[in-house]
Curated annotation (Swiss-Prot):
One of its GO terms (molecular function) is ATP binding. It comes from Chloroherpeton thalassium (strain ATCC 35110 / GB-78). This is DNA replication and repair protein RecF. Transmembrane segments: none annotated. It is found in: Cytoplasm. The gene is recF.
Amino acid sequence: MKLFKLSIHGFRSHQDAVFLPHDGINLIYGKNGTGKTNLLEAIHYTCLTKSFLSTSDSDALHFQAGHFELEAVLQSDSENESKVRVYYSPAEGKHVFINKTPLESFSKIVGEFPCVALSPYDIALTQGSPQERRRFLDASISQTNKAYLADLLSYRRVLAQRNKLLADMKHRTFSSPELDVWTASLSALAASIIFRRIHFVRDFAQYLENAYADFQSIDETPGLTYKTELSLNENSFSEAELAKQISEKFEEMKFDELRRGLTLFGPHRDDLAFSINNLSLRKYASQGQHKTFVICLKLAQYFYICELLSEKPIFLLDDVFSELDSQRAEELVRILSSKRSGQSFITTTERKDFAEVKQHTIGGIISG
């Protein structure tokens, strides 16, 4: 996947800007506060209809603008060209168009223009709450598996309905036929989601090990494990077996859920555990090891999506060089400039002397 042209109006700090990137690595440099991250956000919006930061659409509005509009020309690795337009205003909401055709559902774009983003905030993947790691799981699988995304969205809707019913029934000591219906639906969706997540983690482990191996200066073995309350046979289990266990678990927790008015079990409460050399990353790793793990997670995510889709994602790396020493920075550039990598965008506060990198000043982009 390649971005040929990006036009920006009323987005963040950019009132009007046009960006014409190159193939391979694009390094965007400039002082802090000049809109470098905003540019990466705009690219992410055109690929996935949202920012890679936890912000709302209204937050992305330029302070002098009543709406923002992004237009991107993208080309797949098979040379199919697409034009994506994202429009947002507080009055009209968000609208997304692909080749002038409006999207009925924003989820339809997921996986069409694969994109991976890495920012300093991603340290939350290893140091933050389980929600951050579930979000990573869902983003990785959803871009490569539309059935998973459909089940995930359905699960969230059913979970909300079940939680509402549980809240209404709070402190009762008996169930109801309506709750049983929602529980059966949630159990089936939960089994599908957990089944795919576990298989993803097993496959992804090799991509993570490969990402570590790409850095010659690192001599560590990473690991990850899916954490759920279910008792699973590590060698073999079926989706049907998962569904049976989940139904039994809900039956076991029924009275606790009625007492608390909340769904207490399911993939929305699961987690990922990370390790280095078989030791817990959270408990034993240094800050530098955490940063390295996050970078390798994102590289692994990039190459995982690339292989499953047979399409190289666009890679957005915000201020990544501040997290790396000079040797690992050079190793990262070598990885990103290899034939198996595609187009990438790296922001930094100063110009870097890498032969493989096309340099852009943020001021030059803003002036269009």
